[in-house]
Amino acid sequence: MRTPYLRELLLLVGVLLAPNCLAERVRVPVSLDHHFIESLLREQVFTGEQDSLRLNDDGSGCQYLALSQPRVNTRGGRAFLRTRGEARSGRAVGGRCLLLLDWRGELEFTQEVLVGDDNKSILLKTTSWRALEPDGTTAVVSTTIGGWLEQFLPVTLKQTRISFAQPINQLESFLAGIASPNDMGGTSTMLGSLTIDSVSAGGGVATVTLAMDVPSVGEPVGEPEQRAESALSGEEIARLEERLDAVDAFFTYTIKSVSRGAEPKDATQLLEVLMQLRRELVAILIEPQGRADDPARSLFVDAWDGLVPILQVVAEQQPDYERALRYLTFMSAGDVLRALDHLGPAAGIEVSSDGLRRLARILIPDDAEDPLQHGDDVDPELRKSLGFGAPLPPPQAFNDASFNDASFNHIFAMDWFFPRAVAADVLDSAVVRKLNNWVPKSGDMDVYLPMVRDVLRHVVSEQLKANELTGEFHKVFRWLVFAAAWQESCWRQFVAQNDKRVPMRSGSGDIGMMQINPKVWRGLYDLQGLRWDIVYNARAGADILEHHMINYAIGKGEHQTTGAIDSLARSAYAAYNGGPRQYNRYRRADASARGKKVDALFYDKYRQVRSGKELAVAACF
């Protein structure tokens, strides 16, 4: 099913709703590929074991014609169905078969491709057949086979019907449900007239021409007035964030659903789609003002474009026709929204919460879960969907953020002079509590930095215990984690603000020592743990870095491309900092100036860590 059979509806609807159209019959081609037709044949005709059909079978094993393994191709205006064939004609005598015919080979059925009388289906009508030699030439076989085919071939193979009624009806219902109340009449008129006008076959696909009557629209008067966009109010920004969160929730739900039928290798692509969407969401919220477009609509379109290729692959893997049909209808409905994007408000369609729910229900119709549920809890299924392991150990309970600087120093002064030893595989809980209640100053570095180094050693040790990363890369990974923590925060989890201890936070909302964004990583990590537990924050950062090192740096062969094993650390950090698709940013000539600078600064720190000078992080203070 590489070519979704309703994908071209997006073009149809886009043409129909374009401004200044006259009333006319608009025709648009739609393609059905052989995967989809074969799945329908397996569902309706070849229903026996191993996709087989048995004709004139007397149950003795001595008389039958078996057809199996249907394959479809199209050329020259016709469809050609090939099957494996096995024929026996004889009688059972004394537990054995006395056979007049015992034949095995291939059969090919030539079929006309026609529009059904309901104008919402196409027909594959069998007009002739032949037996084939292994080289594809016509074979001579007994007339018995021809007689049986004439007499016993089922109606569903003589005339196979491919119905468009269900997806067209679903599409009409979906668009009617998300249309503006002021545009319902025009939308209903156009979609209600949708029928199949003609069909042709060739090039491996059946091309169906859909047609629809388009109502005329008025001519615009003059040029549209160009007006400056007014600044958004706080309430408008809150509503925008709600809509953006709905798009995020929709794709999170969809990605989890799609992953259940996907191959493990698809998890990397699913992660890229979700991470790119969430990074764009964060960028929109950083600068929500002055956007003339609809950010929620743009966010949907960009994410949809990334998801569709994965949907196509997963659709091919569906085990039955109904689920394949569901995927194709889902893709078609989403593509219609995609096509309507450039028309904006004139189309009378918006990417609303209700519309996203309706779209999700096309793919998963019987799920009781709200597709737009937007929770902050760790979601084990989402972690699995994106190629991560089990959730991290829970964070340590956090204390009130307020503190008095003098009393704080007094409480812990003695411990700073007598720091406790910490083994790589064991962390003293008292040390963790101290770090989680400490806003270090420049004079504290002789004590603070060795303690954080112990935390990072422990985190690396724990991360490597899962044996996801082979031993030859362990040192590089350790240096990577230390250098990334240095680059991101100078090993700091907290800063002082208005006499309170608060998590270190960037302008884009990244938090803690590893600068992890809660909106980007929602559902994969405990958000409170990221804020208030330095160990949990470090674990999350190491978890992400290892994932990127395995799936991008090593998976893409960066060390082989450059001939340097340290490129694995540079690649993993580029993906960590810029998103998975930036895994090769550190060596790309076309990388942004900012990206080049960030990668150069990281590599400088990495080399210092590699040479045993990780405590040079003190220069930050």
Regions found by a protein language model. Name each.
Residues 1-9:
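Bacterial N-terminal signal peptides that target proteins for export
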Residues 42-46, 50, 154, 158, ...:
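Sec-exported extracytoplasmic/periplasmic mature domains
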Residues 498-522, 575:
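Short, surface-exposed glycine/acidic/tryptophan-bearing loops
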Residues 23-400, 405:
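Extracellular/lumenal and peripheral-membrane lipid-interaction modules
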Residues 392-434, 438-449, 519-621:
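Non-catalytic cell-wall polysaccharide-engagement segments
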Residues 422-496, 555, 559-560:
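Export/targeting segments at the very N-terminus of extracytoplasmic proteins
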Residues 26-27, 95-100, 111, 128-139, ...:
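Second-shell loop/turn segments in exported
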Residues 18-19:
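N-terminal signal peptide c-region/cleavage motif recognized by signal peptidases
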